[in-house]
Amino acid sequence: MNAGIVVGIEGTPAGRAALEWAMREGMLRGRPVTVVHACGQPFGREVRAMSDVEARRASACMLDAAVAEAERAVGGKPEIIERSRHGAAAKILLEEAQDAELLVLGRGHRLGVVDVVGQSVSAECVRHAPCPVVIIPG
């Protein structure tokens, strides 16, 4: 999938902190940063009420805004790859991290909440990631 840094975000302060950390690390290492948002999760009525097209559009807008905000905060950016994917967050993050050097997650946001299968997304990623996992406090 990629040979750089993968960061999972979902629009919270912890996700923004993880993105900023990943972007700084990407600039230090000279590596691309893949910013991943799992859309279409059954976490609330607002998501269930959206069509797939609306959910993907909202996810893409959120990704663009998060990267722009992090770029301002960090003062630059490495090569950025944005991925908005439909499905279970842990599964998506683990797939994206297959060839990654690092997987970066924020603590205190949805990645720490119980996923559809009843397990913490961050715990699932720590247990099964093919690369080191960095958990950034939010």
For every predicted segment, state its role:
Residues 51-62:
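A short acidic, glycine-rich active-site loop
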Residues 37, 106-108, 137-138:
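Short secondary-structure boundary segments
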Residues 102-128:
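Glycine-rich, Arg-bearing micro-motifs that act as flexible, cationic patches
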Residues 70-77:
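Short helix-capping segments at alpha-helix termini
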Residues 34-36, 81-85, 134-136:
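General small-molecule cofactor/ligand-binding pocket signal
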Residues 4, 101-102:
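Structural motif
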Residues 84-92:
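Charged docking surfaces used in two-component/phosphorelay signaling
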Residues 2-49:
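Small/aliphatic-rich secondary-structure junction motif
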